[in-house]
Regions:
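Positively charged n-region of N-terminal signal peptides that target proteins for export
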Residues: 1-5
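Glycine- and aromatic-enriched membrane insertion/assembly motifs of diderm outer-membrane
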Residues: 71-73
Length: 208
């Protein structure tokens, strides 16, 4: 299957998000969760392009006490240093308030180092107390488009304090082989300080 890249995905994203709207079935939340769960990495892309870092993304389902929505835990780390992830977060998946998109809402963990390798624990032990995670005021909204899901961060991006960035934006494409992501950080002057430029990061599914 050919995966959308570069400017093509921008056109596809605009088309998908500006198409006539309709209420999505709840099953779309489960489909997005299945796309995200498991292990993906950028090792194949990094072997071809030297400036692309080799990164692993690990995502698993968790239970948040008192929550009716579906929650995932996700961490990203350089493959050479998996025990020191540079990004850890919980994702709440639900339909958006208008029912027309799937919303992935980010929550930040209390004491992130205590959650490292959470996905290696048995499913029944991955139970999270609600007061140990904090709403990060950041959402990605996804819509189905053919056999893909395409998503963007909320208008204006998300607040950040990471590697010189005060704002982050992302466009993601979920597909059968994994995920393409245009993850970018911008400083207070609106200048990009890290992240994807001419090409997306290409995360591809691994057997685990």
């Amino acid at each position: 299957m050919k995966i959308l890249t570069g400017g093509v995905v921008a056109i596809a994203s605009f088309t998908a998000l500006s198409s006539p709207v309709y209420a999505l079935p709840q099953a779309n939340v489960d489909t997005v969760a299945q796309h995200l769960m498991g292990i993906m990495d950028t090792s194949a892309q990094a072997q071809q392009i030297s400036e692309v870092p080799s990164v692993r993304m690990t995502t698993c389902e968790v239970t948040v006490e008192g929550a009716n929505e579906r929650f995932l835990y996700q961490e990203q780390a350089l493959i050479r240093n998996l025990n020191q992830p540079y990004r850890q977060r919980f994702l709440r998946l639900s339909l958006s308030n208008d029912g027309e998109m799937v919303e992935s809402r980010t929550y930040e963990p209390e004491n992130p180092e205590t959650w490292i390798s959470l996905c290696e624990q048995p499913r029944e032990e991955r139970i999270i107390e609600r007061d140990r995670i904090t709403d990060a005021n950041c959402s990605v909204y996804l819509v189905p488009w053919h056999n893909l899901y395409i998503g963007h961060t909320q208008p204006g991006g998300c607040p950040a304090d990471f590697r010189g960035a005060t704002q982050v934006t992302n466009t993601i494409v979920l597909h059968g082989a994994g995920m393409n992501t245009w993850d970018r950080g911008f400083n207070a002057q609106g200048e990009q300080v890290w992240g994807a430029e001419s090409r997306p990061y290409q995360f591809r599914g691994q057997d685990g």
